[in-house]
């Protein structure tokens, strides 16, 4: 049986870390040590990422899968999510409000309607797998994204392979282009930190609009792309630490 919820240690307030699309629980390994200072940390591998995907690739199905995985955690959690993980975090908070006491949401917005993942999926299908070495990964993707994928891909005898189906990743993203998640966001009533990179992938202004909800703080981090916590790890740590000191 594949282990999907990982106990990263620590004591006290449970803190759950949710990775982004095409990521894995391991992409948080550089943040876990300092986040552990604020509570009992758990990481999670989303369905479709190194394990079977739900039969229906809807956000609700992924949230249901997450809820099953964390059912044994009785105390309300601080949930920290990046990208897809951020969306799942606030949708989980909306459908299971008793399980969430605070949110940290990184570079994700409620409404991507009209966007398509078709070209992106075609590009992924053309990646030269397997990647024979760490250097090959970083040369192809760059140092930051290369490390992200090194932490996520399956390593086999002949190199590194994508840890899921391109069609799965495409369809997850395609759903975001057909609907919005403002209603789920408006259902949230816990303290929330919103973090957006200067070179964000989110539609302009949406995360600022999200911050109009009471109890929400918005921070835009300079010189950061979509992987804010890896592009600017020290600044990310500063703003998240400040927030955790107020809620944990």
Locations of regions flagged by a protein language model:
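Gly/Ala-rich beta-loop-alpha elbow adjacent to hydrolase catalytic centers
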Residues: 81, 85, 89
């Amino acid at each position: 049986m594949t282990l999907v919820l990982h106990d990263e240690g620590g004591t006290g307030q449970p803190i759950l870390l949710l990775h982004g699309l095409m990521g894995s629980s391991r992409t948080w390994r550089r943040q876990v040590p300092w986040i552990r200072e604020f509570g009992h940390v758990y990481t999670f591998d989303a369905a479709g990422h190194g394990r079977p995907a739900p039969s229906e690739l809807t956000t609700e199905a992924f949230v249901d899968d997450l809820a099953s995985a964390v059912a044994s955690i009785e105390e309300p959690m601080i949930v920290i999510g990046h990208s897809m993980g951020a969306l799942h975090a606030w949708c989980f908070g909306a459908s299971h409000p008793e399980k969430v006491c605070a949110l940290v949401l990184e570079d994700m917005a409620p409404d991507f309607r009209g966007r398509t993942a078709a070209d992106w999926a075609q590009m992924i299908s053309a990646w030269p797998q397997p990647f024979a070495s760490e250097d090959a990964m970083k040369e192809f993707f760059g140092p930051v994204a290369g490390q992200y994928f090194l932490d996520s891909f399956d390593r086999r005898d002949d190199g590194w392979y994508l840890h899921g189906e391109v069609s799965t990743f495409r369809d997850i993203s395609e759903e975001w282009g057909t609907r919005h998640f403002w209603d789920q966001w408006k259902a949230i009533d816990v303290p929330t930190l919103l973090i957006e990179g200067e070179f964000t992938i989110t539609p302009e202004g949406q995360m600022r609009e999200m911050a109009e909800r009471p109890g929400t703080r918005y921070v835009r981090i300079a010189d950061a792309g979509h992987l804010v916590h890896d592009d600017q790890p020290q600044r990310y740590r500063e703003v998240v630490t400040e927030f955790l000191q107020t809620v944990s």
